[in-house]
């Protein structure tokens, strides 16, 4: 029988066991992020000692970094921003050398190309600024010794989705602007887009996260303690 928490729901805990006690299933055959190896696994008949389990809302250490259980998710903000920044550099390099056909004019002189590059830079730059602003404010709250308010948690939850989706859309725009050079296998732009499409399937990039963020803005707790 599962142990029930204060709200009457089964308690959810994370268990740490040696890899040799788990069976890893070769299931990670995906559009992008192929190198992460995020395979499924199963564990059967393994006794886990209580000291090798923990719940995310059990704070184990002192200090700002450990004051709120969901802070570990914030590292996900840097991944789409880094991929999008790489895509911008790559696209700029290609378009600076590309000659458009049949016009035989440099791509960098084309109004459509210039507008797309300006828009992509603004999209990635604004997402980065919003992430830094939101996360910086959140950190200041924790640094002061306080727990984050519903409003602070709402802003951070919404920031996850905004950063992921904005970076993905910016790279999609770059791929469309660069053209066939961006869809060749081995092109870093092609890989950038596939990786961001795959990242977009993570919980922090889903509409559900936006719904939880909206609930937090109205003072309603999210179903996960890390949101």
Predicted regions and their residues:
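Generic structural signal for well-ordered, non-transmembrane alpha-helical segments
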Residues: 82-85, 118-125, 157, 161-168, ...
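Charged/polar positions within long, soluble alpha-helices
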Residues: 89, 93-96, 129-132, 136, ...
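Glycine-rich beta->alpha junctions and the first turn(s) of the following alpha-helix
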Residues: 31-125
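A short core secondary-structure module
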Residues: 1-24
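An alpha-helix initiation/capping motif
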Residues: 107-114, 118-121, 150-157, 161, ...
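C-terminal helix-coil-helix/basic helical segment that borders enzyme active sites and/or dimer interfaces
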Residues: 126-162, 172-183
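Short beta-alpha junctions and helix-cap segments that line functional grooves
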Residues: 26-29
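Glycine-rich phosphate/cofactor-binding loops in nucleotide/flavin-utilizing enzymes
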Residues: 178-227
């Amino acid at each position: 029988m599962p142990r029930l928490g204060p709200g009457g729901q089964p308690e959810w805990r994370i268990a740490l066991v040696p890899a040799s006690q788990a069976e890893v299933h070769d299931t990670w055959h995906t559009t992008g992020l192929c190198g992460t190896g995020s395979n499924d696994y199963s564990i059967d008949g393994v006794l886990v000692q209580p000291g090798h389990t923990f719940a995310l809302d059990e704070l184990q250490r002192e200090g700002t970094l450990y004051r709120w259980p969901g802070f570990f998710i914030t590292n996900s903000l840097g991944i789409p921003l880094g991929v999008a920044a790489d895509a911008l550099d790559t696209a700029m390099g290609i378009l600076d050398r590309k000659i458009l056909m049949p016009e035989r004019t440099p791509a960098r002189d084309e109004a459509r190309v210039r507008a797309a590059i300006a828009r992509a830079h603004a999209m990635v730059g604004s997402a980065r600024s919003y992430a830094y602003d939101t996360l910086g404010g959140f950190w200041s709250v924790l640094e002061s010794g306080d727990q984050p308010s519903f409003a602070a948690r709402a802003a951070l939850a919404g920031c996850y989705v905004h950063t992921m989706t904005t970076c993905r859309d910016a790279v999609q725009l770059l791929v469309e602007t660069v053209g066939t050079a961006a869809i060749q296998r081995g092109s870093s732009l092609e890989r950038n887009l596939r990786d961001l499409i795959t990242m977009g399937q993570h919980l922090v990039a889903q509409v559900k996260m936006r719904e939880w963020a909206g609930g937090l803005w109205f003072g309603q707790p999210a179903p996960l303690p890390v949101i």
